[in-house]
């Protein structure tokens, strides 16, 4: 029986390729985490203005990716929509299309360090301030969660 080494499965990556991808993705996530976990971040970096003051939340070209050992999964890639004050908005779509990741991005609860919101803006209006959640430090988000925003996830228990 002859074994042909020249045929390569399109869905297969070598251990060497996997290590290179993992190394690059670790570098990317470490850089993002380093920026996020800085001390004394000036408010100018995360306090912003709403495009429409009638909204309580604005998703603008949001990109949330998962950096794995075998590549990058673009779970949410370019999502934009508004949530007007006093209104209920439903997000509907097929399983795996990014509904939960979108809501986790708003709460800054995406599983880090592999999951990161890498682009766009999520503007959240507390009434006193407008925060770009993508750039808001973890310490500030912890104060916002529960006091100004909360979420009931599809599987609470």
PLM-predicted stretches and their roles:
Residues 1-157:
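ABC transporter nucleotide-binding domains
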């Amino acid at each position: 029986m002859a074994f042909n080494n020249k045929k390569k499965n399109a869905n297969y990556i070598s251990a060497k390729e996997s290590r290179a991808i993992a190394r690059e993705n670790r570098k990317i996530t470490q850089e993002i985490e380093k920026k996020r976990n800085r001390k004394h971040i000036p408010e100018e970096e995360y306090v912003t203005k709403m495009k429409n003051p009638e909204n309580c939340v604005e998703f603008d070209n949001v990109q949330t990716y998962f950096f794995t050992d075998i590549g990058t999964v673009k779970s949410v890639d370019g999502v934009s929509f508004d949530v007007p004050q006093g209104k209920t908005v439903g997000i509907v779509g097929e399983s795996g299309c990014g509904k939960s990741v979108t809501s986790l991005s708003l709460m800054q609860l995406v599983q880090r360090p592999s999951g990161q919101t890498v682009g766009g803006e999520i503007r959240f209006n507390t009434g006193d301030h407008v925060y770009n959640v993508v750039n808001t430090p973890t310490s500030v988000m912890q104060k916002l969660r529960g006091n100004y925003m909360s979420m009931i996830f599809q599987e609470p228990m």
